[in-house]
Amino acid sequence: MTRLAETFARTRAEGRAALVTFVTGGDPTPGDMGPILDALVAGGADVIELGMPFTDPMADGPAIQRANLRALGAGTTTADLLAIAAAFRQRHPSVPLVLMGYANPMVRRGPEWFAAEAAKAGVDGVICVDIPPEQDGALGPALRAAGVAPIRLATPTTDAARLPAVLEGASGFLYYVSVAGITGMQQAGQASIEAAVARFKAATDLPVAVGFGVRGPEQAEAIGRVADGVVVGSAIVDLIGEHGAAAAGPVRDFTATLSAALRRAAQEKAA
């Protein structure tokens, strides 16, 4: 069983949603990433998403765009990201780590090279934002061959006709982008999230994680009542932008409030 499968099985057995946290790799500098990632784990994150900084992050809102600029300004490269991942894996052998980003840095040296290096670094999954599943004839197969999960995105516009294409070859979990827009936007209504999660769960055995627009414990708790995972990114990235190299403490404390919220949701479901 993979680390992702084991983690979602464990959180399911505990009756709660997994906490999936996102930070941009290399923000504020590559050297600051170790303490920040450790803080996420210490705060109760179950899965870590590490964003690959890119010059044109079209799916990201202002917070993550600024994080990309900070990371690139610090000279962060794909090699740095892989080194950060490998060091994280040594410190945290059982915590799943997912790389998330855009196609250009993933395929620049060839998808097979990227997939092999990601696997070597201990990466469990990859989310590529801008390769539609219908056009994923190279990266997805390379990831699967290397034992890395290609994690797919579904959106509010993913209808019954397109959903099979999204799920074809997907593994790890299904990431539901709950708003049709950029990261950090206002969260979608709870009723629409619940309906979407139910629809996806009826179509796949993969865990369904919900993200985009989840900014605090109350939202996380509400989504945690219905989803298998809750993804929080922009709110954490904002803390890093505010505190810089001293962000580890605030990140740990905020992550702990999110983790506690998901445990409250589990208690409410069990009551």
From Swiss-Prot:
Give the SUPFAM superfamilies listed for this entry: Ribulose-phoshate binding barrel
Residues annotated as signal peptide: none
List, alphabetically, the InterPro entries matched. Answer: Aldolase_TIM, RibuloseP-bd_barrel, Trp_synthase_alpha_AS, Trp_synthase_suA
Q: What is its EC number?
A: 4.2.1.20
Tell me if Amino-acid biosynthesis is a UniProt keyword of this record.
Answer: yes
Against Pfam families, the record matches this protein to: Trp_syntA
Q: Does the keyword Magnesium apply?
A: no
Listed GO molecular functions?
Answer: tryptophan synthase activity
General function of this protein: The alpha subunit is responsible for the aldol cleavage of indoleglycerol phosphate to indole and glyceraldehyde 3-phosphate.
Q: What is this protein called?
A: Tryptophan synthase alpha chain
- What is the scientific name of the source organism? Rhizorhabdus wittichii (strain DSM 6014 / CCUG 31198 / JCM 15750 / NBRC 105917 / EY 4224 / RW1) (Sphingomonas wittichii)
Lineage of the native species? Bacteria, Pseudomonadati, Pseudomonadota, Alphaproteobacteria, Sphingomonadales
This protein's encoding gene: trpA
